[in-house]
Amino acid sequence: MSCPEHIVQLMHKYLDGDILPEDETRLKEHLQSCEGCKKHLHEMEKSIALVQSTSHLTAPANFTANVLANLPKEKRTASINRWLKAHPFLVAAALFAILMGGSFFSSWKNDHDFSVSSQPNLVVKNNTVIVPEGEVVKGDVTVKNGKLIIEGKVDGDVTIVNGEKYTASAGQVTGQIHEINEVFDWIWYKIKSTGKSVFGVKESKE
């Protein structure tokens, strides 16, 4: 079809119902002498009629659900990645726990040196720490890779790491007693100690 552009515009106005009477007359006169334009207009009328005839059709109620159900399943890695992005705090906490646990495990394996807390009235003989009878040791007492003998009083907690404890009949501990001889106990103890030092958390007495 090689009709002038203004004729094509008149066709569109005619189909939209916006054509002026004098323009409609001009269009009809042209169509009488141009078989191509007449055919083109007829095809457009058929297309419009087809669209209008299907306007009442609606998709089935479960159409969307069925389409979604038949889509390819999301890869597991994509699902995991989305979960990780949605829970950054949990991921950070888990990574922190893993890194700290690894560090504490390494320190447990490599640390075999004897050490003791620094209260002045503790008596140290070789790898044995003694709380003398009649003495009151203020604060927490920690002994690593050694033996603790309590004959007096400890006003605080007692922690024995990879060692042993003996309490005489007159010995007394006002706080808690922790004996750590397994790597998992050591890791848990270090995590709690780190938490107390960072957040100022105190353990409740049992």
Swiss-Prot record:
It is found in: Membrane. InterPro entries: Anti_sigma_zinc_sf, Znf_put. Signal peptide: none annotated. Binds 1 Zn(2+) ion per subunit. It holds the Pfam family zf-HC2. The keyword Transmembrane applies. One of its GO terms (molecular function) is metal ion binding. Residues 109-206 are extracellular. Is processed by three successive proteolytic events. First, the extracellular region of RsiW is cleaved by PrsW (Site-1 cleavage) in response to cell envelope stresses. Next, it undergoes cleavage at an intramembrane site (Site-2 cleavage) mediated by RasP. This cleavage uncovers a cryptic proteolytic tag with conserved alanine residues in the transmembrane segment, that is recognized mainly by the ClpXP protease, which completely degrades the protein in the cytoplasm and leads to the induction of the sigma-W-controlled genes. GO terms for cellular component: membrane. Gene3D superfamilies: Anti-sigma factor, zinc-finger domain (1.10.10.1320). Coiled coil: none annotated. Its cofactor is Zn(2+). The chain crosses the membrane at residues 88-108. Belongs to the zinc-associated anti-sigma factor (ZAS) superfamily. Anti-sigma-W factor family. This is Anti-sigma-W factor RsiW. It comes from Bacillus licheniformis (strain ATCC 14580 / DSM 13 / JCM 2505 / CCUG 7422 / NBRC 12200 / NCIMB 9375 / NCTC 10341 / NRRL NRS-1264 / Gibson 46). The gene is rsiW.
